[in-house]
Each structure stands twice: as C-alpha cells, then as structure tokens.
C-alpha cells in the first residue's frame, strides 16, 4: 500500500467476523487477543451512531440539567411506594425499613455547613464507625510518617478527577454537542523506563470522538520530550536552544494494523517505515500494514478494541503502550468545555531523584567521569553542582562531563 494513504482502515475483526482468539492461526507471534480482556474490533463512529440512534428522541442525549420533577425526592406518593418496594426487594428488607431509609437518607436531610465549621475536622464525640476508623487512621499517619506520600497522592488524584466535573464553557461555541463520544485513554510508562515499567498507566485522559489524533499526541507529557542534548561542563550558564520535542517531531500511533504518522511538519519522518519493512521481510506472518496521516483522522474514524494494548512511539524509540478502557456518551455531569479536552484526569505520582550532596532538592545535573563524585553517574541540584565544580569566578575545576537532567517527577 502507498505510504500516507487516506483510506479509512478496515476492521477485520468486525467485517470478517474473525474469532478474536484464533485469528492469528499458525502465525509465529504471541497471542495477545484474549476475549476476557478485550472486545472485538469495532468502528468507533459507527458504534456511536448506533448508540445515538437507540437513544434519540428519548431525551437521554440531553446535556441540560434534569428538571426538578425528575430528581429523587420530588415524586408523588405512588412513585414513592414503588421506590420503597424496589429498595425493599434489592436490600431484602421490609417495606417499613425501606420507607425509613427514604425518610432518613432523603435529599431534604442534606444540610450546608454552619459558619466557621471545618469539614476536614472529625468531631470528637462521633458515633459513626466510619468516621472513627478514619480518625484513628489519620492520627496514626501523623504519628508515624513525616512526609506521607499516600496522603499526598490520595488528595492529588481526587483533585485531578474533580476539578473539571460539570464545568461549562464561557463561550457557547465551545460547548460539547449532545451525543458526543468520550473515550478513556490510558498511557503507560515508556518501555525504556525500567524502574516504572509495571502495567500501570502514568496518565489517564478523556478524549472526544471528534478530536483528531494529533490533539492526543500533543497532550501526552513524557520526560523524553524535555531532554536537552549536548555536554555543558564548560558552559553551564548557556541556555539550551531546543529541547528534544522541538528537534524530533516525528511520532506515530498504531491501531489495528494501521500506523498513523504525524506529518504536520516538513522535518517529520515516517517512523513506521522501518517496522513495516522488517515485517514484510522474510514473510513474518503479520500481514499487510497500512500507513496514514495522524492529522487527517479523528477517534471516530478508528477501529479499536477496548482493553487491547496499542502503541504510541515518539523520539525515535520512546514507546508507550496505549490502552482504551472505556467509551461512552457525554453526560450533563461531565466537563462540557471542548477546549479542555483531552482532559487529564489521573497521573501517577513519582518520587523525584534528589541531589547526592544536599539530598533535599531535585537533581538538575548528571555527571560522568567526575573526579569530585563518589559514583558514576552522579546527580546534583543546581546549587550543589556549581559550588562543587566551579570556583567563585565560574571557572571549571577538575575534569568531568556534565549533562542537564530532567527528572521523571517533573510532571508531579
């Protein structure tokens, strides 16, 4: 197939009704397609149209707030009786207990905080078991841990998930359309990160079906893009002209037999060409791969499997596994501002590498063949690096090689 073709990729798993397990036949490559872990391949746009066709006209696509009459607690007596009966059936309790639950746990029992009341302070004389457990846990944490990573991560994740919930755009033109698809995309650590190569996403994003693949590509944050090339021991004050992302702009996504290459800039290269040529040599059994331009395709144009590992490659050899774990219609409680998507909702918290000397500040420099360092390589913060390796006039002391260091915890 000609490189950079615009044809919409086919979904062999759908059109051909291919068995997801036996599809590889006698091929000599690992069997990844496990039906209990991922779905069959399907076309995202067609799936969305089928979904919208089922719901259209029923009011289920509306992004407006539900009317007061549709809220819990605003129904009539007959509706309340039916609700009590359903609760009694689900909880295997009596109708009287269900009615008591409705009375005790109803929306009318929710109250605002009084002036000067701090929701973070747990009352001393609480009778609630859950609050008691939480209080003992927090007291133990304060007694035993000075800097609590778990607590910081817990608060951070909550803030990431909640900061955009229900947010509406100031400009009505940026409002997400009713029936828009939202995909949950998990980006795992790059393969070259040996320390953090567990099967754990370090970024989870929500993307819209109508967004181009390049919008996801531009929103992925990776420390490889921030690397600074060159050796700076003789010129530590020289500001670098470029970072890696400015110099090496090539990248691709791989989805279902198609490499989507970023060709927005003249200097972009087709990183997939080497892989395709390797695959086609000696008839390795992978079949024909296709190539396309990333900027010409939206997520609605893709064929994907939920739960299946795909690939994002940039900087030549920095490879991230990408897993799409969910696809759904937008809800009125979602962030409705299109300009905020792709929306980062979760990212992994990393320990930063500290300076070898002060052990307080994050490392900014890494040295090799350093006569002043006890190990090779050795990491220094900016202050300790200059105090140890240069005199008061800024002249270099001794022999060493110095490179700017970008810590993976930069995105914390």
Swiss-Prot record:
Complex formation: Part of the SNAPc complex composed of 5 subunits: SNAPC1, SNAPC2, SNAPC3, SNAPC4 and SNAPC5. SNAPC3 interacts with SNAPC1.
* One BP annotation, GO: snRNA transcription by RNA polymerase III
Report the coiled-coil segments: none
Q: What is its main location?
A: nucleus
Recorded GO MF terms:
bent DNA binding; core promoter sequence-specific DNA binding; RNA polymerase II cis-regulatory region sequence-specific DNA binding; RNA polymerase III type 3 promoter sequence-specific DNA binding
- Name the protein family: Belongs to the SNAPC3/SRD2 family.
Which organism encodes this protein?
Answer: Macaca fascicularis
| Keyword entries, A-Z | DNA-binding, Nucleus, Transcription, Transcription regulation
Chain positions covered by the region annotation Disordered? 1-22
Subcellular location field: Nucleus
- Gene that codes for this? SNAPC3
Q: Could you tell me what this protein does?
A: Part of the SNAPc complex required for the transcription of both RNA polymerase II and III small-nuclear RNA genes. Binds to the proximal sequence element (PSE), a non-TATA-box basal promoter element common to these 2 types of genes. Recruits TBP and BRF2 to the U6 snRNA TATA box.
In Swiss-Prot or TrEMBL terms, this protein is called snRNA-activating protein complex subunit 3
Q: Which GO terms describe its cellular component?
A: nucleus; snRNA-activating protein complex
């Amino acid at each position: 197939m000609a490189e950079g073709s615009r044809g919409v990729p086919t979904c062999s798993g759908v059109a051909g009704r291919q068995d997801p397990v036996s599809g590889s036949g006698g091929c000599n490559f690992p069997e990844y397609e496990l039906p209990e872990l991922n779905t069959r391949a399907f076309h995202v746009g067609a799936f969305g149209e089928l979904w919208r066709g089922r719901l259209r006209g029923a009011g289920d696509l509306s992004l407006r707030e539900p009317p007061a009459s549709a809220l819990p607690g605003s129904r009539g007596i007959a509706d309340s009786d039916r609700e009590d009966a359903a609760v009694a059936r689900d909880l295997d309790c009596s109708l009287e207990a269900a009615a008591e639950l409705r009375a005790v746990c109803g929306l009318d029992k929710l109250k605002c905080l009084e002036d000067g009341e701090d929701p973070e302070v747990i009352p001393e004389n609480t009778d609630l078991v859950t609050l008691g457990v939480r209080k003992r846990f927090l007291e133990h944490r304060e007694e035993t841990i000075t800097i609590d990573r778990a607590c910081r991560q817990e608060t951070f994740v909550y803030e990431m998930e909640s900061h955009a919930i229900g947010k509406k755009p100031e400009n009505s033109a940026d409002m997400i359309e009713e029936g828009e698809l939202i995909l949950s995309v998990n980006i795992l650590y790059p393969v070259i990160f040996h320390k953090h190569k567990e099967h754990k996403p370090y970024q989870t994003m929500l993307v819209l079906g109508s967004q181009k693949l390049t919008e996801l590509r531009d929103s992925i944050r990776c420390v490889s893009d921030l690397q600074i090339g060159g050796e700076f021991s003789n010129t530590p004050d020289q500001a670098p002209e470029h970072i890696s992302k400015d110099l090496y702009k090539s990248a691709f996504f791989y989805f279902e037999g198609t490499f989507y290459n970023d060709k927005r800039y003249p200097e972009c290269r087709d990183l997939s060409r080497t892989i395709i040529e390797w695959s086609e040599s000696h008839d390795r059994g992978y079949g024909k791969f296709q190539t396309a331009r990333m900027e010409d395709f939206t997520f609605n144009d893709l064929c994907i499997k939920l739960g299946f590992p795909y690939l994002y490659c940039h900087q030549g050899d920095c490879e991230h596994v990408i897993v799409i774990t969910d696809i759904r219609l937008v809800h009125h409680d979602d962030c409705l501002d299109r300009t905020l998507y792709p929306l980062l909702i979760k990212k992994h918290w990393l320990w930063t590498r500290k300076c070898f000397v002060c052990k307080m500040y994050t490392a900014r420099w890494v040295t090799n063949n350093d006569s002043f360092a006890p190990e090779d390589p050795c990491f220094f913060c900016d202050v300790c690096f200059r105090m140890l390796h240069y005199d008061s006039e800024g002249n270099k002391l001794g022999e060493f090689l110095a490179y700017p260091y970008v810590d993976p915890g930069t995105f914390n």
